[in-house]
């Protein structure tokens, strides 16, 4: 989703956990305005006025043996209505990446459901897709394959993988309320293995699953300690048939305060506001940039609809910000024409549309 974290100017100092615990409760009135303005100033000082977009493909969906309570792809929740299909061919992944690239995505992630990629044939297909992404597109290849083991990371990096994504999802102190089929330490080891292989790291979480504001700060502190380059922030969009179907949504003000605190705690990191922004922020989605975000998604999520590329790009430009275009080596401009939008919608509606074509969102082994 992003490049390596930036180097901080000498006058920008990350806030402490103690200050973060206070600020994250500034969810209204002048206190929230001041918090957003402070985060906006840090974003501009460190990251300028550019906003990056990213895309993913839901390359393998459903029948996941993990029991993440937010995820409609879990086999533990048969009442959830998520698409189920095996790993798509490498050519289909590349075709989706090309659509996302034309929409402005700088990075494209291959996401698979399941604990990890266990079959040699699947790993070989993903390696092939990564090689083709490097050869045929300008997007930077990323993968989100669950609790991947280090030997697989070695192979994927050799194929050209540049980023690895694995969300922690929530604070360690709240994790048992979200998932019991794998441990927090297993997640941390996955991230550390990717770091040992020199891959750029992408890890964040989903807010609004019942955790306290202090636990949101706890998650941010863990991410900061890991030295994550890119932090995707998602807000729960309860999926029918999952244990979290009836969880009360957090307010737009709580979402914005959390984004601002994450920015102030991690001024050098790239912060992307991803899944759930439509549901939780509504008409205030544009404020994610004032809250400190410097990236977002374009298009649909893994198992639910999002905004089209034109709407997202217009939102960026209306805030006086610039899209950080794909590094194609040639002049690039977003094609917001009706034919281009029609092509996007056509791809989303054809058989692959059930596979989230093209999509962006908050993967962790396919959870979204």
From Swiss-Prot:
InterPro entries for the chain: Aldolase_TIM, BATS_dom, Biotin_synth/BioAB, Biotin_synthase, Elp3/MiaA/NifB-like_rSAM, rSAM
Any single GO BP term: biotin biosynthetic process
A UniProt-annotated Pfam family: Radical_SAM
The keyword Ribosomal protein belongs to this UniProt entry's keyword annotation: no
Cofactor: record remark: Binds 1 [4Fe-4S] cluster. The cluster is coordinated with 3 cysteines and an exchangeable S-adenosyl-L-methionine.
Keyword Electron transport tagged: no
Catalytic activity: (4R,5S)-dethiobiotin + (sulfur carrier)-SH + 2 reduced [2Fe-2S]-[ferredoxin] + 2 S-adenosyl-L-methionine = (sulfur carrier)-H + biotin + 2 5'-deoxyadenosine + 2 L-methionine + 2 oxidized [2Fe-2S]-[ferredoxin]
Domain Radical SAM core: 46-277
Residues that, per the record, bind [2Fe-2S] cluster: 109, 142, 202
Top enzyme class: transferase
UniProt pathway annotation: Cofactor biosynthesis; biotin biosynthesis; biotin from 7,8-diaminononanoate: step 2/2
Gene Ontology MF terms in the entry: 2 iron, 2 sulfur cluster binding; 4 iron, 4 sulfur cluster binding; biotin synthase activity; iron ion binding
Keywords, sorted A to Z: 2Fe-2S, 4Fe-4S, Biotin biosynthesis, Iron, Iron-sulfur, Metal-binding, S-adenosyl-L-methionine, Transferase
Cofactor: [4Fe-4S] cluster; [2Fe-2S] cluster
Record EC number: 2.8.1.6
Domain of life: Bacteria
Binding site for [4Fe-4S] cluster: 64, 68, 71
Region of interest called Disordered, as start-end residue ranges on this chain: 347-368
Family: Belongs to the radical SAM superfamily. Biotin synthase family.
PANTHER family: BIOTIN SYNTHASE (PTHR22976), BIOTIN SYNTHASE, MITOCHONDRIAL (PTHR22976:SF2)
Complex and partners: Homodimer.
Task of the protein: Catalyzes the conversion of dethiobiotin (DTB) to biotin by the insertion of a sulfur atom into dethiobiotin via a radical-based mechanism.
Protein's UniProt name: Biotin synthase
